[in-house]
């Protein structure tokens, strides 16, 4: 159900509270997922004119789970705070004295419900952390992370239900990784969606038993960051080592991700240097180039009255990854009606060369390769 459809069914006096939750409500580490409501119902009599819904189920993303809490207002007394039912978490009993925004409920503030929900989620986090005391191993993992502010202040924990047969229970740690994405080139962060939210990397680590014999890590990147780093398949984090612990493993993942970001930033500046060198060496032979991301360059060249194009595609992780050179005849066509072309990656190249050296080496390579390309174009293409 879309936020607009839901809001149209809410009692008008309660609508400002709900609107603030579904339109602006982001709670916890996962900034890519908003709060949402379902199961709208009314406690009013059938004679009450609509819209009159005053109770609903609130879905809250937390530590890779979705909490489903019932929120119950009274449309007849909209100035009163709501009641809460915490679904399956029957052991979760919030401390009322710590719920300042509930105790001092201000119906003139549209965000008062959202503020109460945030306080409840904080208490729910403390409740889940307290459950780890049943396992000395999981408590060790939690306490060692807590001692590091960069991890301890950006962590959510969910302890699963205890197995009645074994007495074991699973637990999931969700951490917001302290990785700086601010220097990623802006062109890579465009066109993902209209409201991408915060740029964030979340590491989820699931312990399937209290002795950490089965541990499953997974990295989640916000849409813009995933796109900027080359897609979901571009980054593979290491398996959790047997006998390892989170305080050693999490920095490894941070280091891996930081290096990946640096590769992208370095690649952008190196591609710009590369294209600047080609503009200098080939001058009017440059037909077009990508002036934003510096990922493509096209040259129009001539060798002994034979004109040809060279399309240069620079990869995201240039100069580590070698550019592709595609030679294209301006005269000859394939059977499918395309200009005859050959792609080359087997040519002299070193990622240690600067842009000027790469341009000089490319010019020398063009002279040696073009004769055989011309011969192949005449042999295999059609005028």
From Swiss-Prot:
GO terms for molecular function: polyubiquitin modification-dependent protein binding. Keywords: Acetylation, Apoptosis, Cell cycle, Cell division, Chromatin regulator, Cytoplasm, DNA damage, DNA repair, Mitosis, Nucleus, Phosphoprotein, Repeat, Ubl conjugation pathway. GO terms for biological process: apoptotic process; cell division; chromatin organization; double-strand break repair; mitotic G2 DNA damage checkpoint signaling; positive regulation of DNA repair; response to ionizing radiation. Residues 30-147 are annotated as: UEV-like 1. Component of the BRCA1-A complex, a complex that specifically recognizes 'Lys-63'-linked ubiquitinated histones H2A and H2AX at DNA lesions sites, leading to target the BRCA1-BARD1 heterodimer to sites of DNA damage at double-strand breaks (DSBs). The BRCA1-A complex also possesses deubiquitinase activity that specifically removes 'Lys-63'-linked ubiquitin on histones H2A and H2AX. Component of the ARISC complex, at least composed of UIMC1/RAP80, ABRAXAS1, BRCC3/BRCC36, BABAM2 and BABAM1/NBA1. Component of the BRCA1-A complex, at least composed of BRCA1, BARD1, UIMC1/RAP80, ABRAXAS1, BRCC3/BRCC36, BABAM2 and BABAM1/NBA1. In the BRCA1-A complex, interacts directly with ABRAXAS1, BRCC3/BRCC36 and BABAM1/NBA1. Binds polyubiquitin. Component of the BRISC complex, at least composed of ABRAXAS2, BRCC3/BRCC36, BABAM2 and BABAM1/NBA1. Identified in a complex with SHMT2 and the other subunits of the BRISC complex. This is BRISC and BRCA1-A complex member 2. It comes from Chlorocebus aethiops (Green monkey). The lineage of its organism: Eukaryota, Metazoa, Chordata, Craniata, Vertebrata.
């Amino acid at each position: 159900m879309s936020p607009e459809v839901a809001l149209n069914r809410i009692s008008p006096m309660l609508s400002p509270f709900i609107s603030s939750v579904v339109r602006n409500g982001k709670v916890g580490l996962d900034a890519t997922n908003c709060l949402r409501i379902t199961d709208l119902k009314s406690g009013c009599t059938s004679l009450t004119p609509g819209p009159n819904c005053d109770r609903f189920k609130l879905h809250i993303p937390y530590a890779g789970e979705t909490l489903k809490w019932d929120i119950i207002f009274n449309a007849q007394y909209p100035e009163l705070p709501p009641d809460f039912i915490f679904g399956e978490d029957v052991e979760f009993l919030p401390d009322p004295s710590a719920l300042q925004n509930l105790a001092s409920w201000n119906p003139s503030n549209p965000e008062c419900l959202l503020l109460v929900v945030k306080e409840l989620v904080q208490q729910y986090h403390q409740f889940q952390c307290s459950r780890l005391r049943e396992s000395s191993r999981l408590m060790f993992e939690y306490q060692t992370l807590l001692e590091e502010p960069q991890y301890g202040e950006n962590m959510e924990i969910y302890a699963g239900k205890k197995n009645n047969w074994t007495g074991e229970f699973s637990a999931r740690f969700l951490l917001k990784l302290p990785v700086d994405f601010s220097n990623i080139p802006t062109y890579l962060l465009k066109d993902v969606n209209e409201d991408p939210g915060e740029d964030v990397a979340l590491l989820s680590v699931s312990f399937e038993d209290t002795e950490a014999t089965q541990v499953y890590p997974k990295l989640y990147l916000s849409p813009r960051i995933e796109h900027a780093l080359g897609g979901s398949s571009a980054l593979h984090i290491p398996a959790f080592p047997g006998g390892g612990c989170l305080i050693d493993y999490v920095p490894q993942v941070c280091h891996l991700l930081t290096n990946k970001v640096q590769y992208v930033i370095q690649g952008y500046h190196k591609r710009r240097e590369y294209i600047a060198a080609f503009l200098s060496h080939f001058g009017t032979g440059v037909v077009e180039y990508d002036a934003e991301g510096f990922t493509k360059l096209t040259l129009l060249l001539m060798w002994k009255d034979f004109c040809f194009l060279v399309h240069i595609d620079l990869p995201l992780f240039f100069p580590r990854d070698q550019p592709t050179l595609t030679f294209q005849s301006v005269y000859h066509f394939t059977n499918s009606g395309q200009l005859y072309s050959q792609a080359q990656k087997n040519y002299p190249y070193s990622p240690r060369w600067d842009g000027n050296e790469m341009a000089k080496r490319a010019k020398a390579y063009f002279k040696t390769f073009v004769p055989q390309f011309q011969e192949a174009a005449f042999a295999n293409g059609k005028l």
